[in-house]
């Protein structure tokens, strides 16, 4: 069942002080570009029923103290379908957002392209995708809220093309609408919950929490910190002396009670909002990515490994985070803590190598400053991909190595009891890393 909320009710749910855009439009020409029998009458009935003249309502409103352009779909108007006028209005809204340097919030509820207008309607997808790309290139954030339903071209342009994608619980979300799917298709695959599980949306938000969630996101994405992020202070025991050996450094980094990414994020940021998924079918709970507010009210983006072997989806999500922060001019903080990249057959099938390469490239080409802190295990390339060149720091409870000591001993055909000596030879302690010029410094507790 479709969301009964109208376009204007959806706007009122999330925004204050809404000012609608006016559009200069002539009367609908007959039965449209195809001369579709009865189209003009259907259009008139939809207008009379909803009080709207098209399937979108556009304007500006205030959300959490941030002015934004809103594009809200009216599903009661011909199923919220995308016609030429729909495209023209949404395109104009994007153009006005760029002219005024405002973020864009889209409240979708659409079945897709309007068949009464044929290819002229389908071409609106190119128009909207282009406008979204230009807004993205202008460094302005775009947030989509997927209402029920969000299918077809609306999902594939304004929905999935947004920087942050939120959805209402139970919303029907998918490229294929309910009437064009295979007859044996599992309907659960076309839901917001399924899209979240497969990395295509960032969060499911209840209607009562939507205003606050949007306000938090807009506040974070529009107030970047100035200059590089400072590395957080270490959270371990300040009275613990430096590791006396490589083996001890590894043991401390692997200790189950050592502070992990969650503790660092909680201590460093007063407010956070997280993205989820790599937009390619994967989610890695061991890589937390998002945006956090510093005590001065400014925003830093973060990508944090949580001590597990990082999956390909985790590397791709981190790359997505770095590129989004770069477009918005927000400095990045990365927290490194992994025994290494996942190396099981499924990880290889999911593209471990290409995913790591993608993250290396995102960090290397970022125009915003990137700061990295090694908080635990630094396991080879799976850790290095998240490290900022020339701006890497370490905590006393960490190590960084070309390979785990046990694996190195195995490759060198040494007996297991020689792994401790191998750890010393690898010079992986924080102090060793400082001497080698790998890290800039060791942060204190």
Regions found by a protein language model. Name each.
Residues 110-227, 339-445:
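Conserved catalytic cores of soluble enzyme domains
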Residues 69, 75, 83-86, 121-127, ...:
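Glycine-rich phosphate- or other oxyanion-binding loops that anchor nucleotides, phosphorylated ligands
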Residues 69-71, 144, 251, 291, ...:
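Structured core elements
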Residues 7-10, 42, 86-89, 93, ...:
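General structural feature for long, well-ordered alpha-helical segments within catalytic domains
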Residues 136, 305-332, 350, 360-368, ...:
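A structural preference for long, well-packed, hydrophobic secondary-structure segments
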Residues 1-63, 67, 211-300, 304-307:
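Intrinsically disordered, low-complexity segments enriched in small/flexible residues
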Residues 61, 65-74, 89-114, 292-306, ...:
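A structural preference for short, pocket-lining loop segments at secondary-structure junctions
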Residues 50-54, 80-92, 274-286, 310-323:
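Glycine-rich anion/phosphate-binding loops
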């Amino acid at each position: 069942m479709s969301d009964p909320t109208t376009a204007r009710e959806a706007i009122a749910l999330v925004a204050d002080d809404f000012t609608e855009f006016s559009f200069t439009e002539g009367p609908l020409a007959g039965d449209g570009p195809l001369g579709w029998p009865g189209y003009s009458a259907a259009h008139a009935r939809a207008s009379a029923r909803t009080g709207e003249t098209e399937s979108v309502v556009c304007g500006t409103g205030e959300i959490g103290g941030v002015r934004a352009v809103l594009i809200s779909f009216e599903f009661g108007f011909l199923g919220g379908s995308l016609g030429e006028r729909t495209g023209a209005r949404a395109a104009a809204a994007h153009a006005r957002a760029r002219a005024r340097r405002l973020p864009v919030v889209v409240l979708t509820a659409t079945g897709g392209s309007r068949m009464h207008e044929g290819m002229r309607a389908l071409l609106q997808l190119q128009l909207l995708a282009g406008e979204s790309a230009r807004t993205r290139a202008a460094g302005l954030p775009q947030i989509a809220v997927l209402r029920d339903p969000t299918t077809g071209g609306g999902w594939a342009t304004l929905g999935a093309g947004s920087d942050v994608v939120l959805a209402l619980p139970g919303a029907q979300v998918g490229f294929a609408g309910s009437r064009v799917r295979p007859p044996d298709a599992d309907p659960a695959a076309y839901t917001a919950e399924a899209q979240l599980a497969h990395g295509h949306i960032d969060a499911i938000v209840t209607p009562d929490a939507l205003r606050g969630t949007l306000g938090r996101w807009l506040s974070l994405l529009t107030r970047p910190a100035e200059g590089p992020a400072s590395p957080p202070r270490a959270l371990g025991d300040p009275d613990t002396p430096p590791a006396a050996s490589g083996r001890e450094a590894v043991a401390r980094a692997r200790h189950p009670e050592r502070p992990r990414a969650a503790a660092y994020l909680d201590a460093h940021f007063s407010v956070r909002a997280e993205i989820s998924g790599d937009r390619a079918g994967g989610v890695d709970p061991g890589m937390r990515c998002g945006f956090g507010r510093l005590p001065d009210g400014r925003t830093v983006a973060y990508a944090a490994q949580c001590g597990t072997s990082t999956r390909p989806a985790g590397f791709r999500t981190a790359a997505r985070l770095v590129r989004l922060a770069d477009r918005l001019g927000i400095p990045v903080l990365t927290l490194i803590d992994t025994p290494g990249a996942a190396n099981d057959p499924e990880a290889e099938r999911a593209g471990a190598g290409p995913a790591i390469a993608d993250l290396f490239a995102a960090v290397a080409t970022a125009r915003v400053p990137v700061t990295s802190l090694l908080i635990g295990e630094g396991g080879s390339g799976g850790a290095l991909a998240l490290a900022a060149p020339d701006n890497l720091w370490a905590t006393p409870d960490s190590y960084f190595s070309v390979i785990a000591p046990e694996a190195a001993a195995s490759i060198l055909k040494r007996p297991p009891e020689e792994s401790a000596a191998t750890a010393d030879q690898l010079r992986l302690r924080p102090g060793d890393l400082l001497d080698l010029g790998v890290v800039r410094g060791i942060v204190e507790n």
